[in-house]
Amino acid sequence: MFVNNSVDRRRTLRLAVLLALGLGWTATAQAATDLFLTWPGIVGTSQVKGHQGDIELVSYTQSASNIPVSPGTGKGAGPPTQSTPICGQITIMKRVDQTSPVFLGMVLSGNTTPGPVIFTFAKAGSSTPNTTYYTVSLRKVIPASITQSDSLGDDTITETIVVMASQFVFTYTPQLPTGGPGTPVSFGWDCVTNRAL
């Protein structure tokens, strides 16, 4: 996927701003990463080998946090004994394409997708091109909002889509010195029951 230097600088700046805001957890697509979205029933424009028909993304941001809850107030109140995990949401940016009217329709109709909806992070330009090292799989997914703009400053219109889901599964696959995949590390969370999967 071709990305010019001006886009690289904007991505770096965007990441710095997000970190400054102190989000609980964030992940943003970098210049050395190709980022793809696989959404059941939606055909994207990607022609990248292994990701034909996927949706190519410009950036991805995820937040999660855990808010401590104090048992009481006043002089005798002890330290927080409970907490409230918040799954947060996923915000993606993509170029306007044939999938744009579909996402707009899903936002306005409030349609929920059972899933799985999968975000794939793949290393680009390495000795093993497009090697997947991180995936985020969602179930019971709904696009909550969509905003279109020319924020990249060129002739391309982009759109920012906020996605919410009931279940998240995060999987990181390390790369061995030989270039092959290592043992995947996964964590899943159910946002409805607030329990690990």
Across the structure, where does each feature detected by a protein language model lie?
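Glycine-rich, low-complexity segments
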Residues: 11, 27-28
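Bacterial N-terminal signal peptides
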Residues: 16-25
